[in-house]
Amino acid sequence: MDRTIKYQITEEADGLRIEQFLRHQGYSYQNITQLKKMPESILKNGVWEYMRSLLATGDILTVHIQENESSPNIPPVELPLSIIYEDEDILVVNKPAGMPIHPSLNNYENSLANGLMWYYTEQGKPFIFRCTNRLDRDTSGLTVIAKHLISSSILSSMGARHEIKREYLAIVRGSVTPPSGTIDAPLARTGSSMIERKVDFKHGERAVTHYKVVEEKNGHSLVSLILETGRTHQIRVHMQYLGFPLVGDYLYNPDMEYIHRQALHSWKLSFIHPITREPMEFTAELPKDMKNILI
């Protein structure tokens, strides 16, 4: 996928080398190496330049990203997609429950990656699948996809610095006590399982979840959760640890009376745009299967 980004050089960047300026914009060393291999990827005032060239106030720096290949081993499959937002750099999707993010041995043609590969193949565009905030197969809600190597790198760095804010909604049985708080409990694998996690204060990695009850209806509580860290199954294990596991969670609480998947939805996503640096915020309402529990 091709993308052209232009920067007007201000006094603050006067005298910097091009590579220094790009590093200040969030480009990684790997990004700069990748750009060097692309033909005419760096132009200053319309003329090709080396990365070590100096910039002056008023210069126009043009970065031309050229990615002509698609992700291998992701067959394009026409699948329903709820695209909330799209521009030249990112894509925000409201993923349904039951759809994996990536293809796997048992889910080779029903993943979000398959659907997006079809979406771009139909447009005649190459596409490399780069998902920034991954969701479990049975967790619904918002996820952001980077459309090229620069936005991917910047979003990944933002995620590592906890600058991508995610808020979830979950449903549990009963009245949660206390109704708000912070769960600070490290997580580790359960035995030899590659999937299941548990609270483990001796061997676990630090995990922090902030929660607050939003409403109580029909014997259940709707809980808002904000992640400070992003461990595997963090919300699911932390709520179990609190004594209020998510309903429908086959792994940690197989309570399938009202729903047949964990009642967990990524409803709000906010971050600074990786290229324009504008604040972005997206929301996705609670899906019907979760709403029905509260009726």
Report the location of each language-model feature:
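Well-ordered beta-strand positions
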Residues: I84-Y85, D136, A188, K212-E215, ...
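Pseudouridine synthases involved in rRNA/tRNA modification
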Residues: M1-K36, F201-K202, E215-N218, E228-T232, ...
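Short, surface-exposed secondary-structure edge patches
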Residues: Y50-L54, S224, R261
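Short coil-to-beta-strand transition motifs
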Residues: P75-E78, D200-T209, A263-L264
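Conserved hydrophobic positions within beta-strands
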Residues: I83, V172, H210-V213, L246
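RNA pseudouridine synthases
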Residues: M1-S180, A188-G191, D289-I293
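Short Pro/Gly-enriched beta-strand edge/turn motifs at strand-loop
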Residues: V63-Q66, S192-I195, R206, D249-D255
